[in-house]
Amino acid sequence: MIGPSTEWPALTEYDADHLERVALPIGGIGTGTVSLGGRGDLRDWEIVNRPAKGFVPALGRYGAPFFALYARPEAGPAVLRLIEGPLGVEAYEGSHGSEVRNHGLPRFRDCRFAAAYPLGQVLLSDPEVPLEVRIEAFNPLIPADAARSGIPIAILRYVLVNPGAEPVAAAVCGSVPNFIGADGWNLGRDWRGSPDDSMGPKDNRNVFVEGDGWCGLGMSSAGIDPRAEQWGTLCLATTTTEEVTYRTAWAELSWGDSLLDFWDDLGEDGKLSEREGGDADAPVASLAARVVVPPGDSRALTFLLGWHFPNRRTWQPRAPSAECCAPGGADLDRVGNYYTTLYRDAQDVIEQVVPALGELERETVGFVRAFCDSDLPPVIKEAALYNLSTLRTQTCYRTEDGRFYGWEGCSDRQGCCFGSCTHVWNYEQATAFLFGDLSRSMREVEFGHATDERGLMSFRVQLPLERAKEYGHAAADGQMGCLIKLYRDWQLSGDDEMLRALWPAARRALSFCWIEGGWDADGDGVMEGCQHNTM
């Protein structure tokens, strides 16, 4: 049975009885994530500027994202499988059968999951399949380098292992619907009353693209307003440049026939033939790469999913004005995404990442291995490492100017409790020690923008920053904690320029304790007054 990679560390391995709730977010700081599910599926597509738990984009009843394996031994018939483990029995329950995307497609029988965040491995085998598969998925995480830890990409390597005695002709095929215009929030309903995200996209198009050492399918939209949060680009690519076939759209047929047409086409020889997609608003992009796996050997095929959604809006957008609603009008609530200033579009993400892929993986693995090899108790390693994932979820983001902000957390469909709340973020330590520049940007906002002339620091920061003091309430623990964090960040960085710039506001913030009727009005160093705090 296939095992975890010897090149990647693994802290935890989950067996078949413990996979249902496993989901490893893949994405950069401030970019959103796609999660690798415990069985190898891609779930929780949270890349469109908001949380979207449970969101798996699909074109109506078919076309949800998946990767599939074609395998034909030299002296046997071809086998087709989703590169996923089996569904649980409960997944087939529903008023009209299973609500799980792609539930009717065959899967591998045996599945395990190994992880040491941000490295996730899915281990798949089946006595009826001549190849075993290991999915190796990650997004770069490199301490002290927020830019290279903030890339909007999911890197998925499919390692095909041949335990048999004859060569196996194989192909891995990835399919992703062009769902630009949908974000998992404003869902329509199909005829059964189930959520239907195919109603958001409009006039979306896919095109085959090539670059230096890669090829793939670029996804864009001509029908979505370029100012909308849901507007952007996607790119599904592979670093394999030979034996690659693709579809820019699936055949537009009735009911399940579009899926059957695709399945039969791939199953014939592991190649795809182009189809006429008709006028589908969300055409499915499919990309297949072929390889021959010698007996007793393995081959790896790497796929990349890049994204670029620039139009993030503030925590609590105001009612749109006539000016911003007019053609070409400015959206006064738009704060943007820093990552989209580094890349022109999703295709440019792929173009920049491919030549650096080896280095990005080496540095990520080096960090994770050093941490896993430490003498900390395993439970501490797991808690500390795995909770770094919060930095890369929609809990956190960077506005177009590079500043770092965070919700208190995420609800399933929206951020929960706005404003980089000082008396919640007080208790978070990872950012300062791993990405000091991001932590210092929070201090700059707190003291440079959210603290007024009296020394009152708004413990929730409104955006854009012209509105930073609007909230107008102070929290004792948050305000005092920010003073301690300013000292900590200076100790870690030695940034005298930052400290000098923020020092006057820091003095005012401390003096605020001593105002009449304040937290420590008598100045004895013990807070007796009314104190808004999180305890």
Predicted region positions:
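Intrinsically disordered, low-structural-confidence terminal and linker regions
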Residues: 1-8, 214
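Internal mixed beta-strand/loop scaffold within catalytic domains of large alpha/beta enzymes
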Residues: 8-72, 78-85, 92-95, 106, ...
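Substrate-binding groove/exosite segments of carbohydrate-active enzymes
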Residues: 12-57, 267-284, 290, 297-304, ...
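Acidic-aromatic substrate-binding/catalytic surfaces of carbohydrate-active enzymes
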Residues: 29-101, 215-264, 269, 336-340, ...
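Extended, loop-rich substrate-binding clefts of extracytoplasmic carbohydrate-active enzymes
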Residues: 84-153, 251-287
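Short, hydrophobic/aromatic-enriched beta-strand segments in well-ordered soluble domains
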Residues: 124, 135-137, 172-176, 297-309
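A short, structured loop/turn motif at beta-sheet edges
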Residues: 124-130, 161-170, 292-300
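Polysaccharide-binding surfaces and accessory modules of carbohydrate-active proteins
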Residues: 135, 140-265, 287, 312-314, ...
